[in-house]
């Protein structure tokens, strides 16, 4: 009976159906995925985002990748700077420039923008910090770029330090990117005297940027003003993250996960100030419930970027979660019938869109336990979270593609 009810509640996977399911047209529309790097899911994302750009006027596409590296991609899709190969190699973190789905998205954005005036072009943004699971970047790029921007536009006496002072305090970049620091807090330079002084200087530089707002906005373009604000958020966020890497308390990993998602949330809110944004990331970074993970230190929990943004934007934020049936090449086979994914797998469609209320009704109470994943890279949807999800995309089978 539940399956029959869901059959009547399933909608086509397209932009028009999605917008009709939402309570309001969101300023920030986020599509989550339960695993990374599968081109089946990336192709569906590309299809939906193209429709939302063309039919609903969204003008920024933001992905879970390095916000500074993403500037190269944005320059390419808006102006043609660089080659596609170059921006895929240098404009993405986490190795995601190698995914065919991401390459196809960038190629489409460039073609879409080529004959359009600036106001109609689609922008690209990374909204993650310059962070990897194994290490964090040096704050050098963000700090020196912010200092250079201010030094060219305000009285030198207002600057809290010289570029030479920053360079001396930063030291060699490999001190900051040491991969041993992720497992051993004693290897981190995040709480060294130099790092402490840099945190104060970064705060002073951001304060100067804000204090000079009337002058800087009057003498720069909107894009030129967005860039130093990004540098400021990234510099302070990275220095905060490095300080947490040096933490020896049991809360260390929870704090690091929370700080990463705080960087993400701040970047998303800044992008939303510019106009409607489409977002793609892991479900765990976009959900409204607390995110959880088991790591080498034990269980970790934190508020995701989606939870933080939702608390600020209300109905102007929408979260569309993705669920899937199988990833057979990763050992994820047909889901048990008593799980959320098992119920959806009984539907005839290869892909569909469902209102969360319909899913909750079909599952009934008490809701089933989450599906147990046989592969660490896939996180099934938690039925207990349905009340905080605006809509759900279900993909029956994720298949291996040549890029994998």
Residue ranges: model-predicted function:
Residues 1-404:
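Structured catalytic-domain cores with a bias toward divalent-metal coordination
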